[in-house]
């Protein structure tokens, strides 16, 4: 929980925690908040993220624990019709994509549909206003409470999608009750 933590300082802390408490997982929330060594004199953030990414991979191997690194997406996803995130949407991503053994992306279509709510019909409105809102509501009902966990990269396995139940009130993801709706191979 230290802003501006360098990858070297993170490594030192993780080693100490492993030695004292036998940690089994390192979580970085989020990757772009870490800093490199500062040796990048030209201020190239992509190169700095590459250094951080390699450092996290080395840390995982050294401590023999998984490192879960959260990352921001670039804004490119917002300019597409299909808002499902892709590997290329990872901000400053070339090395993240290359170094990671697995990349998981979350997608909630409900989030985007909610942002497109048409005018709510009021008495006296044209039939089209009622129809547009009814179509929107049906589309929202179709995806309400459902999210996708996209396995975009898995070095030692297959990729695809897993549908999950999303409970916004608690920001909680869980299995869907109906197992037949869960998996989607792409």
What is each residue range found by the language model?
Residues 30-31, 72-73, 108-109:
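Short, ordered loop/turn segments at secondary-structure junctions
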Residues 5-25, 54-63, 76-186:
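C-terminal regions of RecA-like/P-loop NTPase motor modules
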